[in-house]
């Protein structure tokens, strides 16, 4: 399907989720769309969806009473009042075209989500990276405080097993997506902006336009509410200065001496991270998380600051963060095979790539670090090639897959073949594999006992963890490290890669689709 989504968004109004009638979601299996479906179903709303692949989330939707069609066809719209699509759905998708022909209400995912927020105090988390983890932390802190928030997150909280919940309380926590400007729909009571860096330049053109969009998002915050951003981030600091000059209520966090919530004595190890927090010279005590990484500490500080400003008990923040289980695909431990530890990480932008690999280096200790990376989107790989290449070189070895860019056309010289040349690693420590099945074979050939391997990048790369563990296990059963049954590296592919069981029309939705 060649058409591109041409979404034009309407601001959130007084329309409620119940006003939408029977809802149909095109591409219901991705994290963002399945979370929205779960939210509507638990509110007692009739929900159907269409998919081409049996995503793990679909069983849960069926159990809640959702109807899932394993096809895309016009008959799926019979009895439907509202059709919901994401930015990953092309404008010429047959169900989208048919919905408009029938005169059905057609809403972008963000517009549909906004209806669920009507009458609630929304806490919206935006930023170039760290959104999903931060949204999860804010959610758990509010849950621990006993306010039972509703939430929709672009990932699954590991122990909860879900990225959405319809709560009984006044608060609604949402991950706000800037990639297509749809975060400008929301009218938050609290806006959290983790950081601002160049990304989604296919939408914004340059960093200045992106920063302007984040400022516009912050200006939508309720005058009685407040804006939170990171004093340690250059973009966040600029945003705070701009908004404060306009008389808006802005609060910052970080290790910077002028941060409103100042973090001191921050220490990270393989067991997690700890820091002390103070505001206006008053100590708020010690905060600990069982996940490592300075960036995790900064993410958690925004949740602490929100809890403080909402006048909720800080003890709730301390206990919630101390038990934070992590989020699927965010520093997720997949398992161990033949004494090789395998992780999965969603990072695809240079900054989170670097942060994740540095943290994994701590985990690896004296062992090696191998990254299996699948770039996400051709435009990003092209525009940020030098920065991505430099970040990947933090690893000891690189196994590179082809770019995952559904709907994108590759120009000569673009893609992973160009990226591999730019990575400043020795030739024998980096390899571009042009077929999906070749990657586990290559990892099993390279990994030594004591090494750490991480799958990283586009959504499909999360599917490789079990294959890696299987290849490593078979290697261990077969003999010494470095030998593995299997074929040669190689094979033809396309921009999307030869990814098992993901038909071209069924890609992860926009909330997970950079």
From Swiss-Prot:
<keyword id="KW-0133">Cell shape</keyword>
<dbReference type="InterPro" id="IPR004101">
    <property type="entry name" value="Mur_ligase_C"/>
</dbReference>
<keyword id="KW-0132">Cell division</keyword>
<dbReference type="InterPro" id="IPR036565">
    <property type="entry name" value="Mur-like_cat_sf"/>
</dbReference>
<dbReference type="GO" id="GO:0005737">
    <property type="term" value="C:cytoplasm"/>
</dbReference>
<dbReference type="InterPro" id="IPR005758">
    <property type="entry name" value="UDP-N-AcMur_Ala_ligase_MurC"/>
</dbReference>
<keyword id="KW-0067">ATP-binding</keyword>
<protein>
    <recommendedName>
        <fullName>UDP-N-acetylmuramate--L-alanine ligase</fullName>
        <ecNumber>6.3.2.8</ecNumber>
    </recommendedName>
</protein>
<keyword id="KW-0547">Nucleotide-binding</keyword>
<dbReference type="InterPro" id="IPR050061">
    <property type="entry name" value="MurCDEF_pg_biosynth"/>
</dbReference>
<comment type="pathway">
    <text>Cell wall biogenesis; peptidoglycan biosynthesis.</text>
</comment>
<dbReference type="InterPro" id="IPR013221">
    <property type="entry name" value="Mur_ligase_cen"/>
</dbReference>
<keyword id="KW-0961">Cell wall biogenesis/degradation</keyword>
<dbReference type="GO" id="GO:0071555">
    <property type="term" value="P:cell wall organization"/>
</dbReference>
<comment type="similarity">
    <text>Belongs to the MurCDEF family.</text>
</comment>
<dbReference type="GO" id="GO:0005524">
    <property type="term" value="F:ATP binding"/>
</dbReference>
<keyword id="KW-0436">Ligase</keyword>
<dbReference type="GO" id="GO:0008763">
    <property type="term" value="F:UDP-N-acetylmuramate-L-alanine ligase activity"/>
</dbReference>
<dbReference type="GO" id="GO:0051301">
    <property type="term" value="P:cell division"/>
</dbReference>
<dbReference type="Pfam" id="PF08245">
    <property type="entry name" value="Mur_ligase_M"/>
</dbReference>
<dbReference type="GO" id="GO:0008360">
    <property type="term" value="P:regulation of cell shape"/>
</dbReference>
<dbReference type="Pfam" id="PF01225">
    <property type="entry name" value="Mur_ligase"/>
</dbReference>
<keyword id="KW-0131">Cell cycle</keyword>
<dbReference type="Pfam" id="PF02875">
    <property type="entry name" value="Mur_ligase_C"/>
</dbReference>
<feature type="binding site">
    <location>
        <begin position="127"/>
        <end position="133"/>
    </location>
    <ligand>
        <name>ATP</name>
    </ligand>
</feature>
<dbReference type="InterPro" id="IPR000713">
    <property type="entry name" value="Mur_ligase_N"/>
</dbReference>
<comment type="function">
    <text>Cell wall formation.</text>
</comment>
<dbReference type="InterPro" id="IPR036615">
    <property type="entry name" value="Mur_ligase_C_dom_sf"/>
</dbReference>
<feature type="region of interest" description="Disordered">
    <location>
        <begin position="495"/>
        <end position="514"/>
    </location>
</feature>
<keyword id="KW-0963">Cytoplasm</keyword>
<dbReference type="GO" id="GO:0009252">
    <property type="term" value="P:peptidoglycan biosynthetic process"/>
</dbReference>
<feature type="compositionally biased region" description="Low complexity">
    <location>
        <begin position="495"/>
        <end position="505"/>
    </location>
</feature>
<keyword id="KW-0573">Peptidoglycan synthesis</keyword>
């Amino acid at each position: 399907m060649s058409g591109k989504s041409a979404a034009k968004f309407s601001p959130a109004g007084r329309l409620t989720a119940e006003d939408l009638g029977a809802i149909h979601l095109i591409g219901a299996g991705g994290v963002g769309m399945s979370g929205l479906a779960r939210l509507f179903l638990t509110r007692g709303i009739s929900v159907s969806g269409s998919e081409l692949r049996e995503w793990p989330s679909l069983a849960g939707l069926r159990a809640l009473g959702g109807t899932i069609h394993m096809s895309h066809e016009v008959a799926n719209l019979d009895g439907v009042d509202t059709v919901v699509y994401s930015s990953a759905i092309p404008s010429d998708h047959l169900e989208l075209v048919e919905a408009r022909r029938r005169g059905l209400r057609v809403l972008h995912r963000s517009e549909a989500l906004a209806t669920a927020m009507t009458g609630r105090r929304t806490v919206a988390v935006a930023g170039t990276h760290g959104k999903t983890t931060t949204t999860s932390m804010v959610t758990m802190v509010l849950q621990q405080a006993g306010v039972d928030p509703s939430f929709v997150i672009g990932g699954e909280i590991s122990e909860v097993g879900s990225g959405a919940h319809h709560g009984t309380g006044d608060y609604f926590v949402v991950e706000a997506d800037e990639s297509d400007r749809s975060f400008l729909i929301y009218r938050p009571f609290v806006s959290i902006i983790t950081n601002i860096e160049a990304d989604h330049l296919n939408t914004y053109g340059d960093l200045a336009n992106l920063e302007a969009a984040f400022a516009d998002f912050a200006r939508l915050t309720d005058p009685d509410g407040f804006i939170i951003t990171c004093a340690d981030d250059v973009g966040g600091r600029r945003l705070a200065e701009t908004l404060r000059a306009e008389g808006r209520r802005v609060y910052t966090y970080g290790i910077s001496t002028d941060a409103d919530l100042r973090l001191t004595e921050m220490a990270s190890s393989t067991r997690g991270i700890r820091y002390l927090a103070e505001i206006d010279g008053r100590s708020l005590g010690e905060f600990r998380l069982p996940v490592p990484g300075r960036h995790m500490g900064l993410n958690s500080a925004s949740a602490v600051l929100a809890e403080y400003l909402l006048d909720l008990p800080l003890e709730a923040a301390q206990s919630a963060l101390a038990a934070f289980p992590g989020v699927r695909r965010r520093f997720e431990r997949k398992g161990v095979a033949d004494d090789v530890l395998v992780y999965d990480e969603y990072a695809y932008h240079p900054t989170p790539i670097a942060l994740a690999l540095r943290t994994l280096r701590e985990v690896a200790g004296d062992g090696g670090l191998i990254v299996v990376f699948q770039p996400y989107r051709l435009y990003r790989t092209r525009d940020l090639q030098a920065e991505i290449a430099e970040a990947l070189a933090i690893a000891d070895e690189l196994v590179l897959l082809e770019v995952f860019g559904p709907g994108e056309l590759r120009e000569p010289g673009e893609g992973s073949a160009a990226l591999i040349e730019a990575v400043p690693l020795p030739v024998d420590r980096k390899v571009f594999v042009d077929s999906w099945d070749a990657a586990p074979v290559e990892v099993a050939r390279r990994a030594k006992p004591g090494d750490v391997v991480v799958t990283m990048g586009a959504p499909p790369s999360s599917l490789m963890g079990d294959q890696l563990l299987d290849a490593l296990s078979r290697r261990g059963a077969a003999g010494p490290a470095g030998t593995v049954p299997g074929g040669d590296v190689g094979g033809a592919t396309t921009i999307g890669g030869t990814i098992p069981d993901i038909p071209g029309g069924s890609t992860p939705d926009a909330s997970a689709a950079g």
